[in-house]
Structure formats: structure tokens, C-alpha cells
Amino acid sequence: MLQNSGLDVTTKRSQLFTLITPEEVKINTGLQANVNNDSIIIPIVTAMNLYIKPILGDTLFNNLKDHFIAVNRNPNNLPDGTTLPDNINYKELYEKVFLPLCWWSFIEALIVVAVKIDEKGIMFNGSSFSENAEAAGYNQINNRQRKIAESYTDELKCYVKETITDKNLLS
């Protein structure tokens, strides 16, 4: 049976591609600064795959990813569309992706931060998850953050619809 050490898992998580950093999620949402960055990586990847990639489509998402990697993850150096054959302003596209991705990452991280699952069962903030007040509080926070994420996502959808004229890029 193959076992991974905690260090192996941390190393593998840090090698996953993300368009934003855990620090950016913390700065732009209500996620506390003391939350371990490693625990936010998987929620960022999940948010990219569930909420951003379907809007952009595989081709446009992969193009953004490739350009982001090419400029050493510095969004200020992304192409502005004047020098590329597809005429896409990747810098502006990144700016439109940034906030929805931060907020969806925050929502995906809430369960990681708020709920502990171990051999004793499911615990919510150190007590039984079945306590209604705490579960209701979690749901209230989750719903509020979801509305914010959906609002930013709607803006991204409008931007893509209005500016991406080559619909083949959205496939």
C-alpha cells in the first residue's frame, strides 16, 4: 500500500496550476489571513474547473492559462490583444475572471475551513455538526457569499458574450 507523507501532499498541492493565489483569495474575500494557504489550493482548482472553465470553454481557458504561465504568473504582463492573432485582451479577461474565481474559491474553501471530518465523524467549529444553530449559520454565510460570487460570475458571462467574437474559442 502506497502512503503519502504530509510533505508529499503539500508538495503536490503546491504544484497544481491556479490562476490566483491563496493570498489573493484572503485579500479579496472574508477568508481570514490565518487560514493555511495549503488548505485553499484545492478549493481554487475546484472553483476554476466548476465555475470559470465552463464559461470560458476549454480553448479560451487553456489560452489564458498558457499566456499566464508565459508571463510568469504576472497578470500585468498578459497580452492586451493588439499583438495576437486571436485579438483577445487576456489582461482584461484575467481581470474579469479574478473576482468570480476568488469568491467561488472562498465558497469552496468554507467547507474545508468550517468542517472537520475525521474518525470521530463530522465536526462543525469544534462541536457536533448536527447542532442546528451552527449549521444554519454556516448556510447563511454560504448563501451570502454565493450571491456575491454569482454577481461577479454574471459580469464575467456578459463580458465573454460581448467581447469574444470567435465562438470557436469558447469550445
Identify the residue ranges that each predicted region occupies.
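Catalytic-loop motifs flanking and including active-site residues across diverse enzymes
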Residues: 101
